[in-house]
């Protein structure tokens, strides 16, 4: 069983607000829909490069899209 990552994100909320489907967003950042689903659900941590790409799609900084608990 895959252990969920500690990194959380608001990608699904941002994607839905932007009126994008999972397939559309996945295509814009060059990953499969399945990979995007895993990232949205916290089952997969994206690479730093992919995190930047996702953030830029929404015009936000990485820390606005991804959160890592302190401590």
Each predicted region: which residue ranges?
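Short, charged recognition helix plus adjacent turn
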Residues: 1, 56, 66-71
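Alpha-helical residues within the helix-turn-helix
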Residues: 16, 27, 56
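Residue-level signal for the short linker/turn that defines the boundary of a DNA-recognition helix
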Residues: 9, 19-20, 46-49
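A short, Lys/Arg-rich alpha-helix, primarily the initiator
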Residues: 1-17
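Short alpha-helical DNA-recognition segment
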Residues: 20-38
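DNA major-groove recognition helix of helix-turn-helix/homeodomain DNA-binding modules
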Residues: 49-64
């Amino acid at each position: 069983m895959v252990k969920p990552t500690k990194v959380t994100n608001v990608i699904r909320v941002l994607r839905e607000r932007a009126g994008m489907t999972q397939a559309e967003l996945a295509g814009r950042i060059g990953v499969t829909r399945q990979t995007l689903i895993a990232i949205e659900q916290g089952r997969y941590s994206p690479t730093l490069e992919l995190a930047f790409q996702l953030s830029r799609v929404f015009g936000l900084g990485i820390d606005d899209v991804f959160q890592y608990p302190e401590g």
